[in-house]
Every structure is written in structure tokens, then in C-alpha cells.
Swiss-Prot record:
Gene this chain is encoded by: ureC
Self-association state and partner proteins as the record states: Heterotrimer of UreA (gamma), UreB (beta) and UreC (alpha) subunits. Three heterotrimers associate to form the active enzyme.
Co-factor binding details: Binds 2 nickel ions per subunit.
Record: residues binding Ni(2+) 1: H131, H133, K214, D357
Alphabetically ordered keywords of this record: Cytoplasm, Hydrolase, Metal-binding, Nickel
Organismal lineage: Bacteria, Pseudomonadati, Pseudomonadota, Betaproteobacteria, Burkholderiales
Official protein name in the record: Urease subunit alpha
Organism: Burkholderia pseudomallei (strain 1710b)
Length: 564
């Protein structure tokens, strides 16, 4: 059987390479967990039939769902395998079949097992977006259809404060937003407002259910507020996210770093166009206690990046272009040199995460697209990374997928539940046809059940006739919704019984380990360079090397995928 024939029947195997969408990125299958000649496949005349690939074992001893012959792309590897799901969690990665007659079976299929055909598909962990302004609930539909299954941030709707800052302020708003979370088929976690100089206003938000606190310059990110916020976070094992002081009113970047006192913190849009000490906030990604992320409008650097940012900034931060001071504030944040350096710092693993900044200088449905566009641009401009060769870009792929899966999960204390494809974790999985990888998922599985899929005319005789578009599936309806999605809260809130007190239906999961995670824990993205930004030219130097690149004029994963 030729390699081509085998791939067409069972999907790629060890040594086969796959192009990701229309990029220059190639991944190569490193290992195949299935056994040649013993593969399982569903369909007429195929293997998964009673007494053949399907066993006589009862429901307790077989998988609820098996994704067959899929290529898994995760931070830990690129492998071909069958994926077992049981009780909404990933149960095993291995070889599925009938253990009574087949060798090497680690996943038993029975009459209780549903099959999702993974032949020829790539499976990734559900994306995690940690910079969400909850301005409109319709963001969730867009995010889920893009492959994001967890959203972390703050807000209360299109209030002026939420339009600018990712904060759900105070216990009353926190309770209302946690109640609203019950209506959406996605994992959610909310950040309280961290700008206060005394502990009580912050502690009461954690007790109300916040998984962390957000410091934002629009509320006054002073050294006193930073110190107090981090002290409360240390006491409650929650994370702090920060948007630093663009105007340098309360101090320069050195004063902010000093206020951290070596404590863990997540820096949003660390390049600075989204906000932060001008012009050198980028320096903080060399700190051991700083977990740096980007937001997607600057990803990657293109010929249009600078032009679109000014108007975005004026709207999002309630500025008036007719006021000279407001205009100067906006222009101070937009620097071609630091945006160009941001591309390279991502490629070298100094910037650890990527998120959206939804409707507040960011696009909620483009986290995954822009991550892979950045990876493509860097391969074209900088060549292979150390660890990759001429045949594949496996290490680069692992580095970039980690930026929106495992690293944000580690940062916000939810990696024990989500963020990777590993046994025991919540079965949030995204299935992609390689030609549409990173752009348009074929199917999104939430908590082991199909939540969203590309589906044709419901009145047609088969599932595929046009119009084919994303439609919500049964995991988004009735009681299934609350049993296939999670709401993350603080341990303090869980112990206080907010689930019963608020009347919540979703399972509440406490965050943990938020205060012990450091930059060295950021998988494939742990580089800590010494960075200097020239205050006059804005040139960025990391460990003595000037970081600069040209803007892209054309990108993959763009217009050809969005004709309609």
C-alpha cells in the first residue's frame, strides 16, 4: 500500500508531512500510536463493526467517544493516534479497537461508543483567550467558532469602563456575570478590578468569584495599587493581569517592576501598542516573574498595522482626536520599531502568550489565525528555528500552539483542567482540515460533546448541502450546556458556597497555582532576554542583538478563506 493510498484511507502516519493552511509551515508526524493492519475506521464495509473492531464490553469499560486516526498537534508532540473521551474528559491517547481480537488495544470500543472520524484531520486543544473585554455576549459565538473554548477577562457589557478595561468590578457585578455564564457553551473566568490601595475592596471581589484581578491605567495603575493588588493575589492564590502606565505619570517602567517585588504577574499587550509604559514596557519580558502576552491587532507586523491602530485607540480609551493631549497619548503608543521586534520576540520564545483584547483594540475570532500568521511570517523572514530542519517546522509549531493553549492555562491556574490534549483533562478539542487549519475549524468538541460544527442545510437529505456554515449543536442546548462547560472561580469563592448562593448550574472549578508559576514554566516560550528600547529611535535590542524585520505585504490565512 503506497503512502498516498494509506494517508487517504487512514490519514498521515510517521514521517508524513502536512502543510498548515496556505502557510509555509510544515509539520511532520513524529509517532503513530495505531498499528499497521489493525487500524479502526467507521463506515460501510469498514472495521468498527460488532465482533470486529467493536467489542462486547459494557459501557463502563469502553470509551464514550473515540476520535479515530487523528493527528494531534500539541506542545508535547505531533503524533497520530486514536483519542478516547469518557465522562467529558480525555481518557486515553493510543490505539482503539476490540481487545478480544486485536493486539495493542489501549482504548476499547463497544456498543456504547460513538465515533468521530479523525482521518486526515488535525486535532488541537481548545484555545484559551485571556484578554477578554466582555462587551457583548455575541463575542462568545465568534470565539467558539474560531476554536477558542475558554475565555478569561472582565466586564459587564458595553459600559464605558468595560469598553476600555477588562474588569468586572465588585461583588454585585461579579454575581451577575457568573449567572450569565450559565447561558453560554464556553468555559469562563472573570477578573475583578485590581485598582485599589487597600485590601478589602479587592478581597471581596475574590470572595465573590473572581479568578484574579486586573490593574488598568485607566483606573490608575500606581505603584501603591500594584503592590496592594499583588499582596491580595498572594493571599488568595489568584492571578494579576496588568495594563501599565502609558503616560509614565506614577513612575517609569522601572518603578512598576520595583512594585512587583518579584511577584508573579501577567502583563497584557507587552509590546505597548495596546497600552503600557511608553516606549519601553517591552523590557519586562526579560523578568523572571513576568508572564508576557500580546494582543492580536499587532500580530503580525504588516503594512497596515500602524494605520489602523490610531482610530482603534481613540475609540477604545474614550479619547477625543480634537484634543491635542489625547492625540499625543494615542500616538505615543504606536511604534513601528517595537511592533516589528514583537514578531521576533514571539519567534524566539520571549513573549509567551497571545490573546485578543476583544472589541477593545482586538478581534475575538482571530487569536488562532494571527498566531499562525506570525509563525508563517517569521519562517519566511528568519528561516528555520534551532531544533527544526529542512523537513519540518515541528518545534516552531509546538512553540506557537503553546501560546494560546497551555501557557495561558498555566498562567491563570487552570492547566489542571484545560490547555492541552492529555488524559484526565476536560475534552475541549478542535478538529481541523489541514487546508483550513487555524482559519475555520471543522468541529469544536466541548466537554466531550460536539458544540459547534460546519453543517449544511438542515432540511437536506444529507448533512453537506449548501448553505454550509457554523451551527450550534446539542452540547449548547438544555442541561447539556452546563455539563459540558466550566466556570472558573477562586478557591475562596468555592469554599464560600457561591454556587448555591448564586443559583449556578455550571460546574465551578477553582484556579490554583497562580502564584508559583514563573517565566521558566512557560512551555517553549521561556526566554528571558535583557531588553533595551532606545528612547529616541525606539530600536529594540535583546541580549545585544538588534531586533527588526520588515512588515508583511501579503499574509496567508486571509482573503482567500473569507470570500463570503
Amino acid at each position: 500500500m503506497s503512502r498516498r493510498a494509506y494517508a487517504e484511507m487512514y490519514g498521515p502516519t510517521t514521517g508524513d508531512r502536512i502543510r498548515l493552511a496556505d502557510t509555509e509551515l510544515l509539520i511532520e508526524v513524529e509517532r503513530d500510536h495505531t498499528l499497521y493492519g489493525e487500524e479502526v475506521k467507521f463506515g460501510g464495509g469498514k472495521v468498527i463493526r460488532d465482533g470486529m473492531g467493536q467489542s462486547q464490553l459494557p459501557a463502563a469499560d469502553v470509551a464514550d467517544t473515540v476520535i479515530t486516526n487523528a493527528v494531534i498537534l500539541d506542545h508535547w508532540g505531533i503524533v497520530k493516534a486514536d483519542i478516547a473521551i469518557k465522562h467529558g474528559r480525555i481518557a486515553a491517547i493510543g490505539k482503539a479497537g476490540n481487545p478480544d481480537i486485536q493486539p495493542g488495544v489501549t482504548i476499547a470500543i463497544g456498543a456504547a461508543t460513538e465515533i468521530i472520524a479523525g482521518e486526515g484531520l488535525i486535532v488541537t486543544a481548545g484555545g484559551i483567550d485571556t484578554h477578554i473585554h466582555f462587551i457583548s455576549p455575541q463575542q462568545i459565538d465568534e470565539a467558539l467558532a474560531s476554536g477558542v473554548t475558554t475565555m478569561i477577562g472582565g466586564g459587564t457589557g458595553p459600559a464605558t469602563g468595560t469598553n476600555a478595561t477588562t474588569c468586572t468590578p465588585g461583588p454585585w457585578h461579579m454575581e451577575r456575570m457568573l449567572q450569565a455564564a450559565d447561558g453560554w457553551p464556553i468555559n469562563l473566568g472573570f477578573l475583578g478590578k485590581g485598582n485599589a490601595s487597600r485590601p478589602q475592596p479587592l478581597v471581596e471581589q475574590i470572595e465573590a468569584g473572581a479568578i484574579g484581578l486586573k490593574l488598568h491605567e485607566d483606573w490608575g495603575t500606581t505603584p501603591a495599587a500594584i503592590d496592594n493588588c499583588l499582596t491580595v493575589a498572594d493571599d488568595t492564590d489568584t492571578q494579576v493581569a496588568i495594563h501599565t502606565d502609558t503616560l509614565n505619570e506614577a513612575g517609569f517602567v522601572e518603578a512598576t517592576v520595583a512594585a512587583f517585588k518579584g511577584r508573579t504577574i501577567h502583563t497584557y499587550h507587552t509590546e505597548g501598542a495596546g497600552g503600557g509604559h511608553a516606549p519601553d514596557i517591552l523590557k519586562v519580558c526579560g523578568e523572571a516573574n513576568v508572564l508576557p502576552s500580546s494582543t492580536n491587532p499587532t500580530r503580525p507586523y504588516t503594512i497596515n498595522t500602524l494605520d489602523e491602530h490610531l482610530d482603534m485607540l481613540m475609540v477604545c480609551h474614550h479619547l477625543d482626536p480634537s484634543i491635542a493631549e489625547d492625540l499625543a497619548f494615542a500616538e505615543s503608543r504606536i511604534r513601528r520599531e517595537t511592533i516589528a521586534a514583537e514578531d521576533i520576540l514571539h519567534d524566539l520564545g520571549a513573549l509567551s502568550m497571545l490573546s485578543s483584547d476583544s472589541q477593545a483594540m482586538g478581534r475575538v475570532g482571530e487569536v488562532i489565525i494571527r498566531t499562525w500568521q506570525t509563525a508563517h511570517k517569521m519562517k519566511v523572514q528568519r528561516g528555520a528555528l534551532t531544533g527544526d530542519g529542512a523537513r519540518n517546522d515541528n518545534f516552531r509549531a509546538k512553540r506557537y500552539v503553546a501560546k494560546y493553549t497551555i501557557n495561558p492555562a498555566l498562567t491563570h491556574g487552570i492547566a489542571h483542567e484545560v490547555g492541552s490534549i492529555e488524559p484526565g483533562k476536560w475534552a475541549d478539542l478542535v478538529l481541523w482540515e489541514p487546508a483550513f487549519f487555524g482559519v475555520k475549524p471543522a468541529m469544536i468538541v466541548k466537554g466531550g460533546m460536539i458544540a459547534v460544527a460546519q453543517m449544511g442545510d438542515p432540511n437536506a437529505s444529507i448533512p453537506t448541502p449548501q448553505p454550509v456554515h457554523y451551527r450550534e449543536m446539542f452540547a449548547t442546548r438544555g442541561g447539556a450546556l452546563a455539563r459540558t462547560s466550566l466556570t472558573f472561580v477562586s478557591q475562596l469563592a468555592l469554599d464560600a458556597g457561591i454556587g448555591a448562593r448564586y443559583g449556578l448550574a455550571k460546574r465551578l472549578v477553582p484556579v490554583r497555582g497562580c502564584r508559583t508559576v514563573t517565566k521558566r514554566d512557560m512551555i517553549h516560550n521561556a526566554w528571558q532576554p535583557a531588553i533595551r528600547v532606545d528612547p529616541e529611535t525606539y530600536d529594540v535590542v535583546a541580549d545585544g542583538a538588534l531586533l527588526t524585520c520588515e512588515p508583511a505585504a501579503v499574509l496567508p490565512m486571509a482573503q482567500r478563506y473569507f470570500l463570503f
